[in-house]
């Protein structure tokens, strides 16, 4: 069946002028305005009701969060606009398999809450590189990991989210891509710079609700339009564009016909676009890196009131992660059915006409569905949903990136920095991050056949596995030491960067114009590459650790799984260095007790807005400090809640197995 008969509006979005008029109505605009007012109100409320004047308050929300905002924030930080654009786009191009990536996380959030976070809390750390410094000693691993994490944020998270959010705004409002980016970032940076982690978590919770309500409504509209689930399965396989040749060039059938295995998540190990061994093992390695060792995710868990709230948040997030298959991937596939000529275009000149890039237009599958299918008012709601997902991800990343920079890099360079100076440095760093990310957007636009999600996963496959190997061994094998971990990371990085640079130099190509990259380098699927890279890093770490001196247990109490319950006092490997750093801070605290000059009204307003006001709280006694430290590193739970949460964890893993089996 010729799918162009599906909707009289099939080509309505080709000219920005028409789309600009689509969203120029009172209902849409008022919903968007209400959305921004509510978000700013929640951000301001969090800003003035929480303590942001200390590093712990700004970066860890004062360890006071309960389970439901943590679960919502974990989900919202993970689901950016890159997911709406990327998952729906890859779904439109190749079927449901990409949704299985999301289900992989159901098992890993349980691993995070039950195995990894207890160790991080007992270690008493704020950042992941800080944990590695306590575990291995020395500074080189900490600085290396901080820099690599910041690079990963720029290459995968920030630039991909900015790009996908801008695609959506460009399609809905007709705004220039870069103007759209500028507006988004201005608002996002404003409440991250001023509000700290509490503002981020509360706005994330609000945005999760908006995101789920909006996308469920759109999913209902989409399935109604296409005639239900059975009709959707049948029509997707027939969604083939009519223009498949350009002059004398006729494109191969595989470039524009839906895959025969579109409705299976486990695909052929050799010819599949997402081969099943890579899907199970390679994806699990990437998911382990992201969910169990990434600053953005772990920071939310560390802000929890106690261990039960951590586990509750992880379980809530796990159930929410069931949704993207149905609210993002399948609507993307329906978009291909309804607007086949545009979404499934294969001729470069046609694609450029529809979406401004020659490699394919699947990235606009979800935005097109919103702009074309939703009635007035609801269209504004969906634009708010996209903005919500974009801004919640960006605020999370900005807050975590500034934490990494401030605590792991800046504090090393400026050992005598006061608390106030650290706060200002963290906020200024966010502005630098934004500039670099915008510069990377054009590269994201053309990578991986124009499929955003494949681009994100491939970069992660080249840089993430060595980090996963180090954390896994650091926590579960006490024999691993600093030289082993460091050289494992360095070798893994060199191999990963070689593949990444080669792929960018040759271009990833597309079905119509394959890349000239040598098969020995680019021919290995990125998920298989992740397995190989993980294995090389793992073996390197183990071998070098066995050939070098072990770390005495006295330095490892409560830093690895086998010693997690030890009561002895730990002598930190970095204790001497910490004493040097802490010395000047005491003198600074003494200095601040000197009577200050009264500040002017503008200066007081500025300090209040940025959370830099100094509260004259009395200094804690040594006993109080000890009690506070005990509370901050306590992982005990009430027996009833531990049982309830364990049962829920088992149910969640069972649901994950069922979903994989049902759609296999």
Curated annotation (Swiss-Prot):
Residues 1-24, 91-95, 170-176, 222-275, 332-375, 445-451, 505-525, 663-664 are extracellular. The record marks 460 as: Involved in sugar-binding/transport and inhibitor binding. Induction: Up-regulated upon transition of the endometrium from the non-receptive early secretory phase to the receptive mid-secretory phase of the cycle. GO terms for cellular component: apical plasma membrane; brush border membrane; early endosome; extracellular exosome; Golgi apparatus; intracellular vesicle; nuclear membrane; perinuclear region of cytoplasm. The chain crosses the membrane at residues 25-47, 67-90, 96-117, 140-169, 177-193, 203-221, 276-295, 310-331, 376-406, 423-444, 452-477, 482-504, 526-547, 645-662. Its main location: membrane. InterPro entries: Na/Glc_symporter_sf, Na/solute_symporter, Na/solute_symporter_CS. D-glucose binds at residue 457. Changing residue 287 to N: Loss of D-glucose transporter activity. Has strict selectivity for D-galactose. GO terms for molecular function: alpha-glucoside transmembrane transporter activity; D-glucose transmembrane transporter activity; D-glucose:sodium symporter activity; fucose transmembrane transporter activity; galactose transmembrane transporter activity; galactose:sodium symporter activity; myo-inositol:sodium symporter activity; pentose transmembrane transporter activity. Changing residue 451 to A: Strong reduction in water permeation. The modification Phosphothreonine is found at residue 587. It comes from the Eukaryota. Glycans are attached at residue 248. Residues 48-66, 118-139, 194-202, 296-309, 407-422, 478-481, 548-644 are cytoplasmic. GO terms for biological process: alpha-glucoside transport; D-glucose import across plasma membrane; D-glucose transmembrane transport; fucose transmembrane transport; galactose transmembrane transport; intestinal D-glucose absorption; intestinal hexose absorption; myo-inositol transport. The record marks 43, 300 as: Implicated in sodium coupling. It is found in: Apical cell membrane. Changing residue 292 to Y: In GGM; loss of activity. Disulfide bonds join 255-511, 255-610, 345-351, 355-361, 517-522. The keyword Ribonucleoprotein does not apply. It is linked to Congenital glucose/galactose malabsorption: Intestinal monosaccharide transporter deficiency. It is an autosomal recessive disorder manifesting itself within the first weeks of life. It is characterized by severe diarrhea and dehydration which are usually fatal unless glucose and galactose are eliminated from the diet. Electrogenic Na(+)-coupled sugar symporter that actively transports D-glucose or D-galactose at the plasma membrane, with a Na(+) to sugar coupling ratio of 2:1. Transporter activity is driven by a transmembrane Na(+) electrochemical gradient set by the Na(+)/K(+) pump. Has a primary role in the transport of dietary monosaccharides from enterocytes to blood. Responsible for the absorption of D-glucose or D-galactose across the apical brush-border membrane of enterocytes, whereas basolateral exit is provided by GLUT2. This is Sodium/glucose cotransporter 1. It comes from Homo sapiens. The lineage of its organism: Eukaryota, Metazoa, Chordata, Craniata, Vertebrata.
């Amino acid at each position: 069946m010729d799918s162009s008969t599906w909707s009289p509006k099939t080509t309505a979005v080709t000219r920005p002028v028409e789309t600009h008029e689509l969203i120029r109505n009172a209902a849409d605009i008022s919903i968007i305005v209400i959305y921004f007012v509510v978000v700013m109100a929640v951000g301001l409320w969090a800003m003035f009701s929480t303590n942001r004047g200390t590093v712990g308050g700004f970066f860890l929300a004062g360890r006071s969060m309960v389970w439901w905002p943590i679960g919502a924030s974990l989900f919202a930080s993970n689901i950016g606009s890159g997911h709406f654009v990327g998952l729906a786009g890859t779904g439109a191009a190749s079927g449901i398999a990409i949704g299985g990536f999301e289900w992989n996380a159901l098992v890993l959030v349980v691993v995070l809450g039950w195995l990894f976070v207890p160790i991080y809390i007992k270690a008493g750390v704020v950042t992941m590189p800080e944990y590695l410094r306590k575990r291995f000693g020395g500074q080189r691993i900490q600085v290396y990991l901080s820099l690599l994490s910041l690079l990963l944020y720029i290459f995968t998270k920030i630039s991909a989210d900015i790009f996908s959010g801008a695609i959506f705004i460009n399609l809905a409002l007709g705004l220039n891509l870069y103007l759209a980016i500028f507006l988004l970032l201005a608002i996002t940076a404003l409440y991250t710079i001023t509000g700290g982690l509490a503002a981020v978590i509360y706005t994330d919770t609000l945005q999760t609700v908006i995101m789920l309500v909006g996308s469920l409504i759109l999913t209902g509209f989409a399935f109604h339009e296409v005639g239900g689930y059975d009709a959707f399965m049948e029509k997707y396989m027939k969604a083939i564009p009519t223009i498949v040749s350009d002059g004398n060039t006729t494109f191969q059938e595989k470039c524009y016909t839906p895959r025969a295995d579109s409705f299976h998540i486990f695909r052929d190990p050799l010819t599949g676009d997402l081969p099943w061994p890579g899907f199970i093992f390679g994806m699990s390695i990437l998911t382990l890196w992201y969910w169990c060792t990434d600053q953005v995710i772990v920071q939310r868990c560390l802000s929890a009131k106690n261990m039960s709230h951590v586990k509750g948040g992880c379980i809530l997030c796990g159930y929410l992660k069931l949704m993207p298959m149905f609210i993002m991937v399948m609507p993307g596939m329906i978009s291909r059915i309804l607007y086949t000529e545009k979404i499934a275009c294969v001729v470069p000149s046609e694609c450029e006409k529809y979406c401004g890039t020659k490699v394919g237009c699947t990235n606009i599958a979800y935005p097109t569905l919103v702009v074309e299918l939703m009635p007035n008012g609801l269209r504004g709601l969906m634009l708010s949903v996209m903005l919500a997902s974009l801004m919640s991800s960006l605020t999370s990343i900005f807050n975590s990136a500034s934490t990494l920079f401030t605590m792991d890099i800046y504090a090393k360079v400026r050992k005598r920095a006061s608390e106030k100076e650290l706060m200002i440095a963290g906020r200024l760093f966010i502005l630098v991050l934004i500039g670099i990310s915008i510069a990377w957007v054009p590269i994201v636009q053309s990578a991986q056949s124009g499929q955003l999600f494949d681009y994100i996963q491939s970069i992660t496959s080249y840089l993430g596995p060595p980090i996963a190997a180090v954390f896994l061994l650091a926590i579960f094998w006490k024999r691993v030491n600093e030289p082993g971990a460091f050289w494992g990371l360095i070798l893994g990085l060199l191999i990963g960067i070689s593949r990444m640079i080669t792929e960018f130099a040759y271009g990833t190509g597309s079905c119509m114009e394959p890349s000239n990259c040598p098969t020995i380098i680019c021919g290995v699927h990125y998920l298989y590459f992740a397995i190989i890279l993980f294995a090389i890093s793992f073996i390197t770490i183990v071998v070098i650790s066995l050939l070098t001196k072990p770390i005495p247990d006295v330095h490892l109490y409560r830093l690895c799984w086998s010693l997690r319950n030890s009561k002895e006092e730990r002598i930190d490997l970095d204790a001497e260095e910490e004493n040097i750093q802490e010395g000047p801070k005491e003198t600074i605290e003494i200095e601040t007790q000197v009577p200050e000059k009264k500040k002017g009204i503008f200066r007081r307003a500025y300090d209040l807005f940025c959370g830099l006001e100094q509260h004259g709280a009395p200094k804690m006694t040594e006993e109080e400090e000890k009690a506070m430290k005990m509370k901050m590193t306590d992982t005990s739970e009430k027996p009833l809640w531990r049982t309830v949460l364990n049962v829920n964890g088992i149910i969640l893993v069972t649901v994950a197995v069922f979903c994989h089996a049902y759609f296999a």
